[in-house]
Amino acid sequence: MASGSNWLSGVNVVLVMAYGSLVFVLLFIFVKRQIMRFAMKSRRGPHVPVGHNAPKDLKEEIDIRLSRVQDIKYEPQLLADDDARLLQLETQGNQSCYNYLYRMKALDAIRTSEIPFHSEGRHPRSLMGKNFRSYLLDLRNTSTPFKGVRKALIDTLLDGYETARYGTGVFGQNEYLRYQEALSELATA
């Protein structure tokens, strides 16, 4: 009986040593990883700094140009004029499955509209996304260069734009035609 208890205690000692060394290795790996992570965060990046061993003027020019990259915004044309999906849209009788095409056409219609953005020193491409929404809100809330513009027209255009861009409901041919009509009416005002 005594030899059996010695055997169990020996197995226990080996298991405790194995588990202890496993915990030690895992802690070592974790601590090393955290130290490397914080060391990488403290520098400019995980690699050699930009412009390493370059003259000071060149480093400053590189930093200026890299900071400009964050300000670049580009929204591509969603549907080309010769897109095959537009041909399907015109030939198909069931229009409900092509709602996304009307959304894309509505967002592309801003670029091709005749709204005189240039009178305020803006360009149609600079009025994409949130800027176009804020432009419409400015038209609605302040005195505008468009003297005869009704607030209901701007509200219709704003609702159509938000539905086309962010809405989850149906945006079909009827909604697109309403939006296009409001956009052309604003352009002629």
UniProtKB/Swiss-Prot annotation:
Q: Where are the annotated coiled coils located?
A: none
Q: Which InterPro entries match?
A: C1orf43 (IPR010876)
**What is the recorded membrane topology of this protein?**
Single-pass membrane protein
Answer whether the UniProt record assigns the keyword Cell division to this protein: no
What transmembrane ranges does the database entry give?
11-31
Compartments it resides in: Membrane; Golgi apparatus; Mitochondrion
Q: Where is the signal peptide?
A: none
Any Gene Ontology CC annotation: membrane
Its primary localisation, in coarse terms, equals membrane
What Pfam families has UniProt attached to this entry? NICE-3
Q: Name one GO biological process term.
A: phagocytosis
Annotated keywords: Golgi apparatus, Membrane, Mitochondrion, Transmembrane, Transmembrane helix
Q: What does this protein do?
A: General regulator of phagocytosis. Required to uptake Gram negative bacterium by macrophages.
Q: What is known of its domains?
A: N-terminal region is required for phagocytosis of Gram negative bacterium.
What PANTHER family would the database entry show? Answer: NICE-3, PROTEIN C1ORF43
Q: What is this protein called?
A: Protein C1orf43 homolog
User: What lineage, starting at the top, does this entry show?
Assistant: Eukaryota, Metazoa, Chordata, Craniata, Vertebrata
